UniProtKB/Swiss-Prot annotation:
Transit pept. (range): 1-38
Name of the featured protein: Large ribosomal subunit protein mL49
Pfam family, one: Img2
One cellular component term from this protein's GO annotations in UniProt: mitochondrial large ribosomal subunit
Location of this chain's protein in the cell: Mitochondrion
Primary location class: mitochondrion
Family stated for the protein in its record: Belongs to the mitochondrion-specific ribosomal protein mL49 family.
Remaining remarks: Present with 1700 molecules/cell in log phase SD medium.
Keyword Iron-sulfur: no
Subunit description: Component of the mitochondrial large ribosomal subunit (mt-LSU). Mature yeast 74S mitochondrial ribosomes consist of a small (37S) and a large (54S) subunit. The 37S small subunit contains a 15S ribosomal RNA (15S mt-rRNA) and 34 different proteins. The 54S large subunit contains a 21S rRNA (21S mt-rRNA) and 46 different proteins.
Keyword terms: Mitochondrion, Ribonucleoprotein, Ribosomal protein, Transit peptide
C-alpha cells in the first residue's frame, strides 16, 4: 500500500511541483491517509493533559531555595572587608546560588543580635553585605547548613 502511494506520488511527478519539503509533506500525507490506524493515535498529548512537574527542565531551585558554594579549599565564602581607610568593617557572603533574599531572611532569624538595618543584598553580584564584623557568627550558622 505504501509503495503504491509513493509510486503514485513520485511516478507522475505531482508531488514535486515546488521545493523538496513540499514533496516530503505530500508523501507523508499520502502514506498517513492510506494507513488505517496511523491517523487515530495522536503524536503529542493535548496541552491540557501536560502537568507542570512533567516538563523537562522544570526544577524549583531558586524559589525559596539557595546554596552557598564553598571555595576550592573547602572554606565558606564569608569575608570581612575594611572600607573608608579602615574605619568601616563589613562582612560579605559571596557565591550564593538561588534565592538570595531567602538566605538573608534565614540568616536574620539565626542571628537576631545583628540589627536588620545592617543587612543589605546586592542582586547583581548575588552578595549579602552585613555592616560590622560577623564573619565567625555567619560561618558558624552556614557550617551547620552547608
Amino acid at each position: 500500500m505504501i509503495s503504491s502511494c509513493v509510486t503514485r506520488c513520485f511516478g507522475r511527478g505531482k508531488c514535486l511541483p515546488g521545493p523538496a519539503t513540499a514533496s516530503i509533506y505530500q508523501t507523508i500525507r499520502c502514506i498517513s491517509t492510506n494507513s488505517n490506524k496511523a491517523a487515530e493515535a495522536p503524536i503529542f498529548p493535548k496541552l491540557e493533559d501536560v502537568k507542570m512537574h512533567e516538563l523537562i527542565g522544570n526544577n524549583n531551585f531558586g524559589k525559596k531555595t539557595y546554596y552557598v558554594e564553598r571555595s576550592r579549599t573547602g572554606n565558606l565564602p564569608v569575608y570581612s572587608a575594611y572600607k573608608n581607610g579602615g574605619n568601616k568593617i563589613i562582612t560579605e557572603i559571596r557565591k550564593i546560588e538561588g534565592d538570595v533574599i531567602q538566605l538573608r531572611n534565614d540568616l536574620q532569624e539565626q542571628l537576631p543580635f545583628i540589627p536588620k538595618k545592617s543587612w543589605s543584598v546586592v542582586m547583581q553580584s548575588k552578595k549579602i553585605i552585613i555592616k560590622g564584623n560577623a564573619v565567625e557568627a555567619v560561618k558558624r550558622v552556614l557550617t551547620k547548613k552547608f
